[in-house]
Amino acid sequence: MKSIFSLLIIVLSINFNHAQSFDDFQITELVKSTPLKNQMSSGTCWSFTTFSFIETEALRLGMDTVIISPIYYVTPTYLGKAQNFIEKKGNSFFNGGDLTFSALDAYAKYGAVPESVYNGIIDGDWQHDHLEIDDLLRRMAISIGKSGYGRIKPNSWKKSIEGVLDAYIGSAPDTFTYEGEKYTPQTFAQKKIGINRADYLEITSFSHLPFYKM
């Protein structure tokens, strides 16, 4: 026991003596970024991570700091996946998850809303929790998709899914005021973020396709 204690003292002494002072380091280039985001209990990493990147890109391009609402894209993305799921009679991917390109495409199509205007947390809630949303929507989509009624009455199922999403995450505004100026999501994206979707490409690889090919 004494030998173990003595060894511990020696290790601590060595670490202390060789500890470096951070005063020796100089910042040569500081990359600006926005605050850390927390998706909490939601399957929306695809939106939170992508728009953290978009916010940082906007700073790199000389724009002011803007905190984008990642939840703004949940409703249109879910509706798009539901449409595909129903058209394919339930034989497609359907849950709360997605990928970066979906977020970028949604940004190009729907613009952006600041989180201070719409954050997707209903009064009385304190965090993002989409477990019930995901379960309810999947059950609805399976029922509608496999019954065939979704293709006959598209307006009805869309209203049903939108109703669930509105109940849990609220409805995003069509117009809003930000820092004293009125915007739509499209004009906000153009004037306050300034990111062009066409400037960004995604690169990946698959084991069943040749590498280093476009």
Label each PLM-derived region with a short phrase.
Residues M1-S21:
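Bacterial Sec-dependent N-terminal signal peptides
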Residues Q20-M214:
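Catalytic-core signature of thiol
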